Amino acid sequence: MKTFLISTLSLWAIAMQAQETQSISTGQGYNQQCYVNLAEGTGQQKANTSWDIAFSVAPEDAGIFINESVGSAQGALPIQAYFTVSDDFNAVPEPAFFEGYPLYNRETSWAYGALNEYHEPGNPNDFGWGVYDPGTQEINGIYVYAIQLRDGSYLKLQVQSLINGVYTFRYANFDGSGEVTKTISKSDHAGKMLAYFSFQTGTTVDIEPANGFDLIFCRYYDLLHQGGDSVQYLVTGILSADGVEVAEARQVNPDSVKYQDYVDSLSTIPDIIGQDRKVLT
C-alpha cells in the first residue's frame, strides 16, 4: 500500500495560513489514482484501469488525453497512443512505422492532451487531431491514431468532429473489424473537468468526485533530462485540477511561511507540484 503525506498550505484560500495534514492512498502497487478535495479533506480512489481516454468538456477546449497511469506490477502496461501520420481510417496501421511517433500528455495544460500533439504552434485553430473551421464553428478531425491497450492489443482511433459541444469518434481493430462510432456530449458532463471513456465497456465512466477535486495523485509520463538526453519516464506525482492555482515554496518553515510572499508565483500549470514534491512512507 503506497501512502502519500501532504503537509501543505493549500487551504490558504479557505483559512489563511491554516495547515493540515492529510494521508492519501494510491492502492497496492500504485494501482489506483486518487482525486483529492482539500477543503473537505477527502480522497476518492479509482482503479487505473477504469478509463482509457478522456475529452475536455470546457466550452472552448478540445483536449483529448490518454490514461498513462499504471501500477508497478511487472508487465503492466499503460494506455499508449501513436500518431500514424495518416488520415485514412480504412488503411491498416503499420507498427514498424507508427511506433516511432509515441504521444504523451504534457501535464502543462488541461486544454491539450496526447492527441493534441503535432498541432501547428501559434495556430489557435489547430488542435492536432482536427482543425477548427471559423465559418462553420466546427472542429473536423483529420488523423488516425493507434491505441495500444493494457493487454497489448491495438485499436485504430479517429476523432471525426466536435460540433455543438458533441465529440464524434470511431475506433476499430487494425483490420477494420469491430468498428464502433461513439458520441460524447460536453453538456452531459457539466461541472466536470473531463469526460472519461473506456474501450473495454464502450461507455463513458464517472471518475471525478461529485463534490469536485483539487489534486490528482497518479502515475504519468514526464520528460526527464538525463545527461544530454531527454527521456519520457513513468513517474508518480501530483497534478492540480483545472483552474487550481499552486505556488511552490522550497526550503521554508511551514509554520511561518506567508501566503502573501507567493501570490505572484501562483500558477494553474498542472504539474507545479509534480513528481519531485512527495514523501513516501
Predicted regions mapped to residue ranges:
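Surface-exposed, beta-sheet-biased, low-hydrophobicity segments with strongly acidic/polar composition
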Residues: 19-281
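Bacterial Sec-dependent N-terminal signal peptides
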Residues: 1-22
